[in-house]
């Protein structure tokens, strides 16, 4: 009995440890300036993605907000068998970007980032930038969060075929993504210079 209790406590401690390792969502998800002030590493990751893939910070962050609400372990809810029994998940999406396994593998192959983890914000930010950059060569505007999000969801082939037209719920979601991107953009313009200061990046 004593050994069973020790084993139980050990498992409990391990579970608590791993739970503590999960990065918590920002306290003020509606304000990009406060997000970057709280999450210094996120700011640097987004700046690297912008430099590499030319995706504006406010567009990228509007994607993350919509896809995962800034939760590192986000997954689609399980389907329900007979209406109440938890069943399989509808897709393989995981993490901040909700990237599908197959698309994530394509990203790793193309970029050489073989150790990329979908639950890592830096990797997820780079993934979103990588995927969005494909749209620039097809005539997408870098600030057109709505169209970029529709292509992100449907694939560029699906976007070209306008498959989203049969999904009014998706069109409404893409409108929300655009609205949030615009809101983040206005906020970002007011704090961009402060964010660039070294003391802001490494102290406080």
Enumerate the predicted regions with their spans.
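Bacterial N-terminal signal peptides that target proteins for export
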Residues: 1-9
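Residue-level detector of alpha-helix boundary/anchor positions
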Residues: 10-11, 58
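Hydrophobic membrane-insertion alpha-helices, especially the h-region
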Residues: 13-16
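C-terminal motif of bacterial Sec signal peptides marking the signal peptidase cleavage site
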Residues: 18-20
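Catalytic glycan-binding domains that act on GlcNAc-containing polysaccharides
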Residues: 22-196
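Short, solvent-exposed mixed-charge patches
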Residues: 202-204
């Amino acid at each position: 009995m004593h050994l069973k209790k020790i084993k139980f406590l050990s498992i409990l401690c391990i579970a608590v440890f791993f739970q503590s390792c999960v990065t918590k969502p920002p306290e003020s998800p509606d304000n990009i300036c406060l997000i970057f002030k709280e999450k210094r590493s996120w700011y640097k990751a987004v700046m690297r993605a912008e430099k590499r893939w030319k995706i504006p910070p406010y567009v990228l962050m509007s994607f993350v907000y919509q896809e995962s609400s800034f939760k590192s372990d986000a997954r689609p809810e399980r389907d329900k068998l007979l209406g109440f029994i938890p069943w399989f998940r509808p897709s393989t999406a995981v993490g901040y970007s909700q990237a599908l396994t197959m698309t994530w593998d394509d990203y790793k192959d193309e970029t050489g980032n073989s150790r990329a983890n979908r639950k890592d914000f830096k990797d997820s930010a780079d993934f979103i930038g990588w995927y969005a950059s494909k749209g620039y060569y097809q005539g997408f505007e870098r600030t057109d969060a709505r169209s970029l999000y529709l292509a992100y969801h449907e694939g560029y082939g699906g976007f070209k075929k306008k498959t989203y037209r049969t999904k009014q719920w998706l069109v409404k979601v893409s409108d929300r993504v655009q609205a949030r991107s615009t809101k983040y953009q206005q906020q970002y313009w007011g704090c961009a210079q402060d964010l660039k200061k070294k003391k802001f990046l490494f102290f406080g």
